[in-house]
Amino acid sequence: YKIRRGKLNHIFISHLHGDHYFGLIGLISSMALLNREQPLHLFAPPGLEEIIALQLKVASTTLPYELVFHPLNKEEVILDTPKFSVETFHTQHRIPCWGFLIKEKKLPRKLDKEKAINLNIPAAFYSSLKMGYDYTAKDGSVVYNKQVTLPNSPAKSYVYCADTIYDERLINIAKN
């Protein structure tokens, strides 16, 4: 996916079968060798912290950055950023297993800069226009947001659910 390791700040593990986390210790160690400094957040079922701690201990490895473990215990929003959110849901597997619904937040409107300039709207108000606000000039005249902006692309979402049997409930989670 061509994501630079330095930009990877959150990792989501669905369950504790080896094919879903065995490569994690290698990634964590590689990040240490590359002098990572910012914390790495791991969202996983309880137990992963002990597994990683044992692997680091046996290898006599001290990380130059913090591992922050977030145990998955219930269906909830586990991460909420200005750009996206992540929520968990149970899936049907032999051991506790989680799916993840990643939802992009509503994108700001697109500004037609040429129209804004022609209507003498100062650049300082452009971000407000993108957020949906109208502009009121000093003389009291109003330029409505829709006069100088266009809707952005609809927000996207992505559902990750691995190693699960057929479950009607997942259809509703994955809709839209």
Cite the ranges covered by each PLM segment:
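Short loop/edge segments at beta-strand edges and connector loops
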Residues: 71-73, 162
